[in-house]
Amino acid sequence: GTTPSRELYKFFDREGNTLVLRPDFTPSMARCAAKYFMDETLPIRFSYLGNTFTNTSNLQGKLKEVTQLGAELIQEPSVEADGEMIALMVEALKSSGLEDFQVSIGQVEYFKGICSQAGLDEETEDELRDYISSKNFFGVQELLERKAIRRDYCEILLKVNDLFGSAEALQRAKELVSNERSLQAVERLEELYRVLCEYGVERYVSFDLGLLSKYHYYTGVIFKAYTYGVGDAVAKGGRYDNLLKYFGKEAPAIGFVIVVDDLLEALARQKKVPRLRADGVLIIYEEGRFRDALKKAKELRVQQIPAELIPAISGADSSDTGSFDKNVKIYREKSKNHMQKAFYYMPAEGGCMEELLDRN
């Protein structure tokens, strides 16, 4: 499994089979790709929205049910694919209204290369991973001393958490190691940075070679987005090139999720209002004109244009223009939506007024 058993919500059906509430979306998407796109050879892109459930009783204040919005890119191993997904995550966060955030990028293979060179067993590597990911320097030191790891490898592993910052940190990371696996991991990050510069999102990213995950299926680049107002990452993701083979399909993959609950909390604390589409249409209708208004709304929705129907406020100015102006004013005061245009269906068999709305 990808999640520790103690963190799962388990149930039993009538036959005694164990059922588990979904703790993580990535394996579900991997299974979906393997089942429904087994013979597909071109890159596959997914997006999804749903809830995950994790028993986090030991973490006070952390939600046990969270809503996640995610995207996955299957069957594309290139560094350009890494850049595409990170850039997409950045743009998604920006479109929500978030402005001050930073994406930390790491590389799982850098850490694994050091552990392999040092000859660490799987149990020691897992324990070391937990200490490094939680920035527990003393835990790392105590573990290495207890396991009698060679002094030169101890010095390297104790410095991993210091390898963070701008692209200059990658040069320090290369100078620290000599094994090919770790060096290739850093070179991949250098290529990734060049791709992100092409996307124009480099100011949002930094590097952290001590960034690791409790999920062991990650095989390459890993990233998390942080902002102020919440204590955890509002978005996270990474490359998982070996996961799909457990479902019968050999395919590389990379993806990310935005933790919607944490993002909304951050926006609220930062007093940011999510940006909404401003290409919609407001349709105001007087008594007896609902059918005409609905017909117009259907026409717009077929064209993928959001249309919002609202009945006219009673007691408005007796003139058609006065009623229209009053209704639009009330709508603006009570709604945070931003409509581009408004239609007003006048009483009885009157006509329809159309006007562009001032969205400032």
PLM segments and residue spans:
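Glycine-centered secondary-structure boundary/capping sites
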Residues: G1, G97-D100, G113, G119, ...
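Positively charged, Gly/Ser-enriched RNA/tRNA-binding surfaces
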Residues: R6, E15-G16, T26-D39, F46-L98, ...
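Glycine-rich loop at the start of a catalytic domain that most often binds anionic cofactors/ligands
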Residues: G1-R6, K10
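Short terminal or interdomain "cap/linker" segment that borders an active site or interface and mediates
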Residues: V103, V108-L143
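Short, glycine/charge-rich beta-strand/loop segments that flank catalytic centers
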Residues: I44-N55, Q102-G113
